[in-house]
Amino acid sequence: MSVDEKVARALKGTTTVGIRSEKAVVLAADKRATAGNFIVHKRVEKIVKISDYMAMTTAGLVADAQVLADVLRMEVKNYELFHKKRMSVKAAATFLSNVLHSARFYPYIVQLLVGGFDTAPRLYSLDWFGTVAEEEFLVTGSGSPMAVGVIEAEYNPNMDLEELVNLAVRAVFAATRRDTASGEGIDVAVIDRNGITMRHYRLGDVIRLVRP
């Protein structure tokens, strides 16, 4: 099987979203894990805490994502211990980009979003070749075509926190309505100057939120 075929199979599942405002970053992801047409797990955590001010969403091969999360978490912690200050989110994304690029001939099959708060909210995307980009909003996974349409139609950088969370949840929910590889509730990470707050929405909670 070629690398392109492996990538296509690995990324056939999951919807993750990242949205940045002037005061916070919101990451959101569904909870379903699939293997082909089979639902393997219904309570997967696709938002990984990297530090007290940084988190990452994962799409792709679970083992690859877990290894990269552990490597990044260790690098951030070592930096903080050695330099006695926080690593910037940009530096963390750049480090992860270098790791991915160094393995480009036998790549980690992942799509990642790294969100955090240093001097301001930051949001970066990374692909399996190490390409890194900073944006106001980003989506990954097989449900991304549906999710990005919701965000593009309604995003405003001046949104307050609850509006931002609501938009992220509705974007992921829209994906779950059309993408069979996404579903089973939504996890949300809110990252601002006070740190990371996790929210967990079951399907009933999501429906009440998007259809008040």
Swiss-Prot record:
Q: Does the keyword Oxidoreductase apply?
A: no
The annotated modulation of its activity is: The formation of the proteasomal ATPase PAN-20S proteasome complex, via the docking of the C-termini of PAN into the intersubunit pockets in the alpha-rings, triggers opening of the gate for substrate entry. Interconversion between the open-gate and close-gate conformations leads to a dynamic regulation of the 20S proteasome proteolysis activity.
GO cellular component terms, alphabetically, are: cytoplasm; proteasome core complex, beta-subunit complex
Single GO MF annotation: threonine-type endopeptidase activity
Q: Which residues form the propeptide?
A: 1-13
Any one Gene Ontology BP term: proteasomal protein catabolic process
Which of UniProt's keywords are assigned here?
Answer: Autocatalytic cleavage, Cytoplasm, Hydrolase, Protease, Proteasome, Threonine protease, Zymogen
Pfam families, per database record: Proteasome
**Domain of life of the source:** Archaea
Tell where it localizes: Cytoplasm
Active site, UniProt feature: 14 (nucleophile)
What is its quaternary makeup?
A: The 20S proteasome core is composed of 14 alpha and 14 beta subunits that assemble into four stacked heptameric rings, resulting in a barrel-shaped structure. The two inner rings, each composed of seven catalytic beta subunits, are sandwiched by two outer rings, each composed of seven alpha subunits. The catalytic chamber with the active sites is on the inside of the barrel. Has a gated structure, the ends of the cylinder being occluded by the N-termini of the alpha-subunits. Is capped at one or both ends by the proteasome regulatory ATPase, PAN.
Query: What family does this chain come from, according to its entry?
Result: Belongs to the peptidase T1B family.
* Name under which the protein is recorded: Proteasome subunit beta 2
Source organism of the structure: Ignicoccus hospitalis (strain KIN4/I / DSM 18386 / JCM 14125)
